[in-house]
């Protein structure tokens, strides 16, 4: 049986495919353009850190704390935007990246930095909106060609441009949320980490999602 498994792994590698990681957190980038909501970009985090720990299943976006004409006039207070499952199901998953633990930690630090009350929580429609938030996350996981000045108010177009410019670095998804979510299995259970605290800064070995402020959509 073991020789057969080795052969399957070798064939997958020769064909340019990587076998699924046993434990890693995947970041998936999403856009939402349907219904009565404003266009929006956000990302989900799903999986288990390589170093061990509790399963991660969370999502983060960035938006104005309140929607008003003041958005058009200048900076306003911003907040993290945590989408409900129904909102995610009505969105579009564009692409994903399997992160290292260091990248995962950096993304959590980004989320914390943009949390309500922090210096980066100021929302500016022109240069500090939801697209800029996912842009920074994409930068932290090693993607390039992220500066797309004409697309920074167009979440779907922006993410599709990033996908096209990062072939080989990302896993294309391009599926409607409901279908994509249905294709996912359960988040892998933590392996041995429940018996030992994580050694990676910023990763908490509990059953809770990452400890950052949340605001339900």
Task: Tell where the protein language model's regions lie, with residue ranges.
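Positively charged n-region of N-terminal signal peptides that target proteins for export
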Residues: 1-6
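Stable alpha-helical elements in mature extracytoplasmic
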Residues: 38-41, 91, 103-110, 126, ...
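Activation targets extended, charge/polar-rich intrinsically disordered C-terminal tails
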Residues: 113-217
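Glycine-rich catalytic cores of cysteine/serine-nucleophile enzymes that process amide/ester linkages
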Residues: 24-93
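A short, structured loop/turn motif at beta-sheet edges
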Residues: 50, 97-105
């Amino acid at each position: 049986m073991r020789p057969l498994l080795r052969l399957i792994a070798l064939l997958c590698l020769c064909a340019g495919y990587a076998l699924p990681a046993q434990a890693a957190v995947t970041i998936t980038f999403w856009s939402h353009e349907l219904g009565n909501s404003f266009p929006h970009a956000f990302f989900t985090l799903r999986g288990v850190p390589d170093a061990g720990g509790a399963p991660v299943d969370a999502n983060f976006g960035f938006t104005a704390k309140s929607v008003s004409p003041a958005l058009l006039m200048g900076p306003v207070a911003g907040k993290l935007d945590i989408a409900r499952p129904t909102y995610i199901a009505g969105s579009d998953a564009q692409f994903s990246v399997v992160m290292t633990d260091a990248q995962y930690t950096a993304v959590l630090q980004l989320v914390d930095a943009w949390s309500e009350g922090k210096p980066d929580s100021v929302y500016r429609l022109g240069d500090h909106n939801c697209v800029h938030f996912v842009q920074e996350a994409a930068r932290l996981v090693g993607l390039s060609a992220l500066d797309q000045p004409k697309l920074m108010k167009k979440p779907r177009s922006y993410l599709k441009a990033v996908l096209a410019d990062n072939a080989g670095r990302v896993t294309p998804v391009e599926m409607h949320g409901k279908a994509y979510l249905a294709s996912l299995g359960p988040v892998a259970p933590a392996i041995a980490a429940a018996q030992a605290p994580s050694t990676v800064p910023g990763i908490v070995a509990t059953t809770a999602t990452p400890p950052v402020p949340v605001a339900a959509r």
